[in-house]
UniProtKB/Swiss-Prot annotation:
<dbReference type="InterPro" id="IPR036318">
    <property type="entry name" value="FAD-bd_PCMH-like_sf"/>
</dbReference>
<keyword id="KW-0843">Virulence</keyword>
<dbReference type="InterPro" id="IPR016169">
    <property type="entry name" value="FAD-bd_PCMH_sub2"/>
</dbReference>
<dbReference type="InterPro" id="IPR016167">
    <property type="entry name" value="FAD-bd_PCMH_sub1"/>
</dbReference>
<dbReference type="GO" id="GO:0016491">
    <property type="term" value="F:oxidoreductase activity"/>
</dbReference>
<comment type="function">
    <text>FAD-linked oxidoreductase; part of the gene cluster that mediates the biosynthesis of hexadehydro-astechrome (HAS), a tryptophan-derived iron(III)-complex that acts as a virulence factor in infected mice. Within the pathway, hasG converts the prenyl to a methylbutadienyl side chain. The HAS biosynthesis begins with the synthesis of a tethered Trp-Ala dipeptide by the NRPS hasD.</text>
</comment>
<keyword id="KW-0274">FAD</keyword>
<dbReference type="GO" id="GO:0071949">
    <property type="term" value="F:FAD binding"/>
</dbReference>
<dbReference type="InterPro" id="IPR050416">
    <property type="entry name" value="FAD-linked_Oxidoreductase"/>
</dbReference>
<comment type="pathway">
    <text>Secondary metabolite biosynthesis.</text>
</comment>
<protein>
    <recommendedName>
        <fullName>FAD-linked oxidoreductase hasG</fullName>
        <ecNumber>1.1.1.-</ecNumber>
    </recommendedName>
</protein>
<dbReference type="Pfam" id="PF01565">
    <property type="entry name" value="FAD_binding_4"/>
</dbReference>
<keyword id="KW-0285">Flavoprotein</keyword>
<feature type="domain" description="FAD-binding PCMH-type">
    <location>
        <begin position="37"/>
        <end position="211"/>
    </location>
</feature>
<keyword id="KW-0560">Oxidoreductase</keyword>
<comment type="similarity">
    <text>Belongs to the oxygen-dependent FAD-linked oxidoreductase family.</text>
</comment>
<dbReference type="InterPro" id="IPR016166">
    <property type="entry name" value="FAD-bd_PCMH"/>
</dbReference>
Amino acid sequence: MASNPKSDLLNCLSGSNVIVDGDEAWPDAIKRWTGYLGKIPAAVVQVTSEEDVIAAVSYAVQNQRPFVVRGGGHSNGFSTVDSPGIIIDLSRMRKVTVDVERQVVVAQGGATMGDGVKAASSVGMAVATGTCNEVGLIGATLGGGIGRLLGHVGYAADTVLSMRVVVVDQSGVARAVEASPDVNSDLFWGLRGSGHLFGVVVEATFRAYPWTHDTWHSCLVFPPSDAGLVAEAVEKVHYQGGMQGRLVFCAPNKQPIVLLQMWYMGSHEEAASKFQPLLELPSMTDHPLNFVGRRIPYPNLNDSSDRICGYGGRKNLAAFGLKNLSAGACVAALNVYMDFIVQHPEAAQTHVLTEFYSMDVARQLDQDGQETSIPGEFRREVKYWVMPLAWYDDPALDDACAGLNKAIREAFLTQHDGTRARGVGYVNMPFEDDTTTSVFGEGERLERLRNLKLKWDPLGVVQGIVKL
């Protein structure tokens, strides 16, 4: 193994940049959304082409260097690695093209959600993304992809038509292959839902959708004492089509409040009537964060998340799926959150997000699990995605913040009779105690994934977010 990989890598790359410790660009090259679980690699390879991805992967494998892939750099610990490992950084491969006639979007591996929205909206189209502009579009899709169009078209992975992925064979040689329903269909199944396990995706083709609507958006503010009332109301609504929302525990000025955010991706005339039971709740109408009926142009749909999605500080984000939301569980989780803020006021930027979407379309898609490797529980058993986000600066709080996330999960899952409801793991945002089976399930699906791993990554060089 070479002591410094820079010269060796530059010799085998065509137009890519290699950055190592001591270079002026080094601090920016290893910067991520969160400093939590950050590691120091031997080098960061900022690739610019499929050929250079192949060369970088081949170099890493042949020199016994672990490697990880960085798209948007928003995972807790996936896109970072210690020396002698290297980071293959796709951030200079962000081209997005739209074919209006074919209604498709083609995105390079480093394209962000914001890149996808910008390109699609420029020609009157939309593409399935999450809620953060700077998160990697393809990286999020590989794990299923919760997001804005879920109620209309299903998970982001449901909208993928094909992918190009760099894989490594038994001899350690890297190559790019196509994956689609017609070519390497087994790999295509695995990529759509468990795609971090198999290779480096350098390009994906998504369905695009004609889109002319602004999005209706409202935010109601409540005191903590009303959390149970709000949870009961949220649980009673059947979300359809473009309806989506988010229940938020947050503490602006270190004073905890509950937010109920609502979006409707569709006709504004329909929005208020569909959300009427929630709009009738007694919110704090004089609060500066309380408003009803704003319109957001599609290109700006995710702009309100820019602060929470921006780089800097230490953030520990995890997620799990939940079937039902009870008033008691919501109040218990809020109490855990408020106790934490009292004990650690320096971490008052911490949020707890509970997102909900219309699931009617997602439940109708891929009912037998033969088209995607998205867990069937995502479609049948999840109505809510709970996402505790511990946000702080002091590394001394790492353990306390990791503990908070787990305590929030347990509060939501503990039922009134003391039994524990089943939570559904999310591979894109795992808890630190998540396991192979809590994320990928058991039985036939897990066995199929393991067989695919042996076929497409026989040397086990692609680390994945959660190990098989």
